Amino acid sequence: MNSSSSRSSMSMPMPMDMPQMHMGMNNNCEMNQMMHPIPNFPMKWEPCTPPDEKPHPSMLFPPLSGIFNQSRHSSTGEDYHGSSSGSPSSSLSSPNEFKDEPLGLDVHFGNSLFNAPFSPSATSSHSPSSYGMMHGSHSMASHQLHQQQLSPLPSVAHFSHSHHLQHHVVQHPSQASLQMNMNQIFSGPSHQYASSSVPHTFLFKDSTIYEGMGGMGLAAAQQQLKARNKMHEMAIRQHLITDQNITANGDLVLSAEERRTLVQEGYSIPQKYPLTKSEEESLKIVRRKIKNKLSAQESRRKRKEYIDALEGRLHCFSEENKSLKKQVHQLEASNRDLQQKLHQYESKEKM
């Protein structure tokens, strides 16, 4: 009997004290939290829920009234860190805050984003620390992704509070870089704004091509003007035309070529100064024709000289070619003689 009672007492588990039971429950909860960590909510703390149970909708999505009725930070005494409301326009401050800044951008909103201390509390998204706001939104986004994987409900990320928070937080560094670039642009006193009158170096990749083309056109025009002046001087020197002095008075003396060309073209021959408008035009036309004739004669003469020079070079090259051919024939004949002598010597050595 005693042995049976002792055996039963050994087999029965000993009752645990209440503090030990609570300690075991706390350990189990801590193990669940370590295996299934739940990040901090930006709105409030919620109790730990097992992964097999569906969370309450208030844990996933905060009430809309709390989102839209949150008070904005005052611009006096603290930096601007962005509003946590759901309105897209809430990220902008009042016009009076930015009246001294270009484009309505705040210069100091990036300082709190990187210089503020990290706040791991649940209300870090509502604190003046933008880093805590960014951390809270990131943790809430990861928790919502985990809950969406467990829940059969479709995702409504466009209604979530973290979507607006991430939108504001992501926009701040780009706005800070934009503000820095704008400060660099507006700060330079010698900066010139781009307008429609932009030089060719900004319109084309390689402006040297177009500048080179302009230089070539200028050189061609200068060469043409030089040729005309040369023809005019040559015509005067050969007494083909006479200088036209409009302010002169008295008799007009024309060259024989001018008189002949005037008659040939059907114009009247002027006799005295001052000349009428028609007489001036007729003399200009006649003198231009004489210059063109002289220019054509010069071009034909130069062409004939060039052809004569080419013919002379051709004659010289042909004579040189003939002499080289004679030398080749002589060398071939001497080579044949040497080969015959070599064969004779080889035959004598064999004998």
UniProtKB/Swiss-Prot annotation:
Molecular function terms from GO: cAMP response element binding; DNA-binding transcription factor activity, RNA polymerase II-specific
Region of interest (Leucine-zipper), ranges: 307-314
Encoding gene, per UniProt annotation: crh-2
Keywords: DNA-binding, Nucleus, Transcription, Transcription regulation
Localization: Nucleus
Ranges for domain bZIP: 282-345
Full protein name: CREB homolog crh-2
An individual GO BP term: positive regulation of dauer entry
Species annotation: Caenorhabditis elegans
Comp. bias (Low complexity): 82-95
